[in-house]
């Protein structure tokens, strides 16, 4: 019996009482047998996540949101109407499946997006698995505004390159922002591009969105684009060693970028002018890398763009400025 014990009032317990105690006690210890509704499951899940050493940096900022997202999407329910379903009863199979997912989230530190094979960026759903970085980029916010005011006429944009496309999420958003453009997504990882192909198919863009395996511009020689966007690797060597366990489920190739986090950005900017049209520009995300960017490219005219994460996450550089800067560097 549990340490707390069962107590009978008055006389000592009969053999029937003892038998019932042994039948019931395991049920009290097993959450499977005590969670009846989505509300019950949600309360238990939040406690499990909140009391575990977890990191929430892959779309859900807290245990509350992580639990609601996991439960809703595992049950194929719309999370914007979560409250409507809180008192709905769960089937045994539903309960077992979600408790198993919570167990993997807590003990394996697997990000919820990988557990569900699903991630959301702005209001768009994307397929995701461990072959590609979980979609998260402030560039998505800028694409929602069609990169205004920098792209003055979205319908006039003819070509866009998403460098380091990964799952293809930004390339797909770019295709929506610039309907007349030929959008190309490139990545060094063929495995990541297989994920991008799934998303391209899901968004019915197989005829319009081009995917190219390339180490940055290597397989794009001779091609120029009106706009280049990139969310490249920018995590420093020291930061890589300190990353929470959740991030270690992601491809290191999509994160690691040398001592100052600028190894890939240096290569991108050094060649970008050769792949931009005359009035073209590049938009690059660098996390908290403002100081690293300014140290790596002193004197380069760049504009830091305002996003929800601050004014030090994403920058823009014009082709003419890049060409002049790197010409003088040599």
Regions found by a protein language model. Give the residues of each.
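A general structural signal for well-ordered alpha-helical segments in protein cores
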Residues: 42, 67-68, 98, 167, ...
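SAM-dependent Rossmann-like transferase core, predominantly class I methyltransferases
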Residues: 85-92, 96-179, 189-195
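N-terminal auxiliary segments of SAM/dcSAM-dependent transferases
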Residues: 20-122
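S-adenosylmethionine
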Residues: 144, 180-182, 186-330
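Alpha-helix termini
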Residues: 52-57, 146-154, 204, 276
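Acidic, Ala/Val/Gly-enriched low-complexity intrinsically disordered segments
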Residues: 11-13, 17
